[in-house]
């Protein structure tokens, strides 16, 4: 099979290569998937780059945790009726606090546990499906980890990003009123089109003042946070008493110093979101919800660009540059 690989961390153009690798076989409890689209998440790029001291955890890595395709074979213990099923995949490569799998979705074929290949919603194509594993499931967990959000007001920082854009739609579908923060006017349009009540330009507006104005001084029930270190003072200031901050990243500073009493005075709840560690029951609920929302056309996946496998290094650079209104996907 044709696959993208790397054997050392570093710049994309220097370490990623394309070549033939042995075809995998479906083992006990596994399915073999012909990959059609491979989603790229910031975590994939960080692993390849060696961000924050990350080391190679396997001698050779086929990158990318998310993808979509069709099942072409099954291993022992898996019903053969799954052959031909369109699926999206999660946790195909890597992980946090564990080495995880070595071989991800940036290849023509992948063998992985059957439960990690989920039936693709009828209304989504492979390119969209390749972004359900991390962006959409992280968004689901950030919105619903503590139950229903019906009637709540939610602030979503980074609302135009891959996770944020999904979170806006999932929260609105759940009955919440959403305020999103963005960094420019096109991003604001993108977020309002997804259903947000308001989109605030953090570069042009006093976000804290505007949130309190919009909520009549009450604040928000929940904050979904893309960069905890950068925004924790804001989050504490706009949070209602006993509200929750659900943070899924802190890239600007992996070891932020917490303003304890800003949160303690509100009786705040801090919820840290890790898409690789969603409890099994919650994951099944999330998978079912994403399918329902997608098939009801309440969830769309924004795509900024697609690249062929041969141009995977360019795709990684596109993710690193940031600012995309949508996901970057490698087609295979």
Model-derived features: where do they sit?
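C-terminal hydrophobic helical "lid"/dimerization subdomain
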Residues: 1, 281-332
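Glycine-rich beta-strand-centered segment in the early N-terminal region that forms part
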Residues: 22-40, 51-93
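NAD(P)H dinucleotide-binding glycine-rich loop of Rossmann-like/cofactor-binding domains
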Residues: 80, 90-158
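Short glycine-centered segments of the SAM/dcSAM-binding site in methyltransferase folds
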Residues: 86, 153, 177, 243-244, ...
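N-terminal Rossmann-like NAD(P) cofactor-binding module of classical short-chain dehydrogenase/reductase
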Residues: 88, 223-224
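Glycine-rich phosphate-binding loop and adjacent beta-alpha segment
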Residues: 95, 182, 230-298, 332
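Mid-domain Rossmann-like dinucleotide-binding core that forms the NAD(H)/NADP(H) cofactor-binding site
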Residues: 130-204
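Short amphipathic alpha-helix with an adjacent loop that forms part of the alpha/beta core around
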Residues: 207-217
